Every structure is written in structure tokens, then in C-alpha cells.
Amino acid sequence: MKYTSYILAFQLCIILGSSSCYSQDTVNKEIEDLKGYFNASNSNVSDGGSLFLDILDKWKEESDKKVIQSQIVSFYFKLFEHLKDNKIIQRSMDTIKGDLFAKFFNSSTNKLQDFLKVSQVQVNDLKIQRKAVSELKKVMNDLLPHSTLRKRKRSQSSIRGRRASK
């Protein structure tokens, strides 16, 4: 995996140590530059509805929204990776990636690396499929709210204890 393009853009965020290394005006300008490059302000872009906004509007609870946002952020990182050789929009993409990194990953390089690692797992590889199925139960248990999991473990322990005493 190539992290160099991400790491270079994000090192400034880490060095500055701020929650956001770019002013919102700078990020907005770079987004407008990308819109211009892709002609994304054209009226036909909205044909068929929004790509992500309607989905985001459905989810109000922060934990639910984070799940959807992680998929959307993954899409943008894949888009920027696909366009990485385009010198015309490189600065805009680097600025936006840096801001996404600061906001979504709280400037944590480890979180970013794990996120990229998970998003780049190949599902058509048999070895990967076998590992994924092997880990499925633990992943499913990790999805449970921790208080429910503890209650279940406690009740299973007390049931086992009663059976042993009979």
C-alpha cells in the first residue's frame, strides 16, 4: 500500500499539532477549485439526486452517522488515490485530504493507516475470505454494545455455576 501521498499531506497537520491545520476558507477554496476542474457546478450534476447528502440526512445519532461517514470518507480517499497523478488538482486534493485527516481521524496517523488497511482489503482473495470468516464471530461480538455483552457473559457464568452445583 502506498501511504506516501497521504503521509506527506498529513505531516503538516501533525507538526502543527492543531485539530485542523487548514483554515476553512482555504479548504472551501480548494473544494471550489475541484468543482471547477470537474465542472461540478453544472446543473446536470444534480440529476438523479444527491450521492451522499440524502443518506447523511437520514442518520441523526452520532454513532450511526460515523458508520456512514466512514464509508463516504473511504470513497473520497479512493477518489483522490485514483486522481493522484493529476498535477492540476494535486494541491487541492492534498489540502482536502489533510483536512479530512484532521477532522475524521483526529490527526491520528495510526487511525488513518488502519482505516486505509481495512478499506483496501481485497474481497476476491480466497485466503482473505477464509481469514474474514474465521474472525467473523469476534467481529460480530465487537459490534454488540459492551454493556449487553457483559450482561450476557454474567448470565452465562451464573447458569454454568448453577449447572455445576447440581
Swiss-Prot record:
GO terms for molecular function: cytokine activity; type II interferon receptor binding. Keywords: Antiviral defense, Cytokine, Glycoprotein, Growth regulation, Pyrrolidone carboxylic acid, Secreted, Signal. It holds the Pfam family IFN-gamma. GO terms for cellular component: extracellular space. GO terms for biological process: adaptive immune response; defense response to virus; humoral immune response; positive regulation of autophagy. Released primarily from activated T lymphocytes. It comes from the Eukaryota. It is found in: Secreted. Residues 1-23 form the signal peptide. Glycans are attached at N39, N44, N106. The modification Pyrrolidone carboxylic acid is found at Q24. InterPro entries: 4_helix_cytokine-like_core, Interferon_gamma. Homodimer. Belongs to the type II (or gamma) interferon family. This is Interferon gamma. It comes from Marmota monax.
